[in-house]
Swiss-Prot record:
GO biological process: translation
Protein name per the record: Small ribosomal subunit protein uS14
Quaternary structure annotation from Swiss-Prot or TrEMBL: Part of the 30S ribosomal subunit. Contacts proteins S3 and S10.
Gene3D superfamilies recorded: 1.10.287.1480
Keyword flag Ribonucleoprotein: yes
The encoding gene: rpsN
Amino acid sequence: MAKISMINRDLKRKRLAKKFADKRLSLKKVISSDASSYEEKIEASCKLQKLPRDSSPTRLRNRCEISGRPRGVYCKFGLGRNKLREAAMRGDVPGLRKASW
């Protein structure tokens, strides 16, 4: 089980990334646009730098929804490998079964 503070920190980052996503996208469009002047690009990059650091989606970490484990997380299910295995063995995940060859 991950520390509660780490889980809460990641949740805070998700909220901030969602809150500033539109603003961040519009500033990045101005920076990468050929139609923008040099001054507009500089101004947009300054505004982008002044956004909260945790609002960047790069700082997000995929965590298991149940245990908060940061590694070995399957994006499709949102669960860590251990919890996914437990859920599959209980039959909670439809269509998922143990591999056999």
